[in-house]
Amino acid sequence: MKWRVNTTPDAFTHSTVDPCRFGALNSEVIFSSLELDVGSCLVDAGCGPGEYSVLAARLIGETGSVIALDRDPWMIEQLRQTIAAQAITNIHCQVADLGAPLPLRDQQADAVMISAVLHMPGLTDRWQILFSELQRGLRKGGKLAIIEKSNASAPADHPLHLRLSPETIAANVTPHGFEQCGLVELRADKFLILFEKY
């Protein structure tokens, strides 16, 4: 079953409480789509400095865990500093190439999120590896949320040739044991496409 939610302006904020990469999108919309709860295990693939990882760690509590992966050592170091400064104990971060085998156990995660990553040069030709690895690391029934900028418009800060349509993403994800189960318009130029592992 497919569903679509059009969020209101209240669905995102520009405060430091929710400092997300896409102009501070509301993490509640994203995390509720992933069905995160106390005790969940989330993989934040392409975590950057870890804005979502930190917010998720608070939500899932000490019995849950966040596995934060990024190919950039500097980003991982920023997240490690945040973890230390805030005494967070349930985030495990690691430098990892998303286009190569991932440091995940089979069916380890309840949910995976990928925000503003798929369009990056160097990864676009290795999606098949990434989606196969995420399928391996995600439990049956687990959710995969992909957040990208829409290709419907092209502001100067994000060239059109780097934009992805939900249809393009779905065509590449579904052959790897996933079914599309949602499409959320986060803003006019940003969307979340949701999949479930079957």
Show where each model-derived region lies.
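A short acidic, Gly/Pro-enriched loop at the edge of an enzyme's catalytic core
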Residues: 99-112
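Class I SAM-dependent methyltransferase Rossmann-like catalytic core
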Residues: 6-25
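Conserved Class I S-adenosyl-L-methionine
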Residues: 157-176, 180
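A short glycine-rich, Lys/Arg-flanked "PGG" loop and its adjoining helix->strand segment in the class I
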Residues: 128-140
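Class I SAM-dependent methyltransferase SAM/SAH-binding core
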Residues: 43, 49-100
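Conserved alpha-helix/loop element of class I SAM-dependent methyltransferases that forms part
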Residues: 21-40
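Conserved beta-strand signature within the Rossmann-like core of class I S-adenosyl-L-methionine
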Residues: 141-148
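Core SAM-dependent methyltransferase catalytic element
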Residues: 182-198
